Amino acid sequence: MLVFYAPLFVSIFSNTVMGATIDKPIPKPILREAIEKIAVNKRADSRYCKEEKCPPGKHCPKVPIVCVRGPCCF
């Protein structure tokens, strides 16, 4: 009987301990910063952001990574 319960106890205990450490939610500020950084990098890769002279009605800074807001960045 002990042979049956020992592996069962070990598997339940290890799942509980591992589940508590692996399933921790990511803190929201860190996740938000990561998403914003990805969005800025995606906008910086836009073809308009790399041009110094934009089409009429568009606004682009000369430095691509600074291109955070504006129609040409989306």
Curated annotation (Swiss-Prot):
Q: How is it modified after translation?
A: Contains 3 disulfide bonds.
**GO function terms (MF aspect):** potassium channel regulator activity; toxin activity
Which segments are removed on maturation as propeptide?
20-41
This protein's record includes keyword Secreted: yes
Give the UniProt tissue specificity note: Expressed by the venom gland.
Q: Name one GO cellular component term.
A: extracellular region
Q: Which UniProt keywords apply?
A: Cleavage on pair of basic residues, Disulfide bond, Ion channel impairing toxin, Neurotoxin, Potassium channel impairing toxin, Secreted, Signal, Toxin, Voltage-gated potassium channel impairing toxin
Q: Which residues form the signal peptide?
A: 1-19
Localization, UniProt = Secreted
Mostly located where? secreted
What does this protein's UniProt record list under function?
Inhibits voltage-gated potassium channels.
The entry's family comment says:
Belongs to the scoloptoxin-07 family.
Q: What is this protein called?
A: Kappa-scoloptoxin(07)-Ssm2c
